[in-house]
């Protein structure tokens, strides 16, 4: 098959996240099976407009902000002649409304849709624009086959008017061969970590407040990731008088991330909504429990009481208190870190990128054959 993927960013982008990791891991494997994959995405400063990474031919156009407005024009003028067997639109940020494009076959791939959570992050005018851009999905994409990365995302699509029969749930994977436990690396004193982007909607502030409530002088919170909310979070740590025990690591390379997760007593995630929660499975693969919000997507990457703890998310003050209580439980029973971590590792091993790629390819072939 000749395949075109439309995604807001590629996996080399400095701001790449879980959607881009999925893109790389799944579609590089599809290339390895003998198929041709092109990617049309946004560009950034000082990067070539044409590239090839992991066998995927990359076409870059516009910026993060202009890509949705330039993608169709670029496709019409430069890529339509390639006569793709199938086009995959990763419904990421602002929809491209590809059912209005002239393509043979189309699949919509969804990690998660913003819905009302966009108002936690963006200014009211921008948030309203994104929210409104999602409103036509149920009507415009009603005849399009969907691939969702979690049952939570599938249910969100159904609520928006997409037929349940049109949705195939294919979970993400995790590289359990690279991400492995090493109990000898576990920190002697309680260490909690957050791994992800520092954006307002991720609610890292609740992780910091929960850690402050723990009130344990020998404990440490390490925050790995970049984003425009870092200064606010640093200010919060100072206001709570815990700046000496909260470390902001910035971007952490893959090899250092593994050691960070191995050292941690738990990984903590407070996001109100994710496609699935890849960072939770990365922690689990390293034998580290997870304390996370019982929110859409995330709840499918943690087995409450077995691989970590899920805390109610509706009331933020109560949520921070519940996260602090979960941290305190691990501190009071250190052996629980190993027990939960061992179960987490077994759980993570059931999610592989090979399976995700195989299931995705089977779904695409099924759509093309109809």
Ranges and model annotations:
Residues 289-292, 302:
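Short hydrophobic beta-strand element within catalytic cores of glycosyltransferases
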Residues 125-149, 155:
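Membrane-proximal helix-turn-helix segments that form the acceptor-binding/catalytic region
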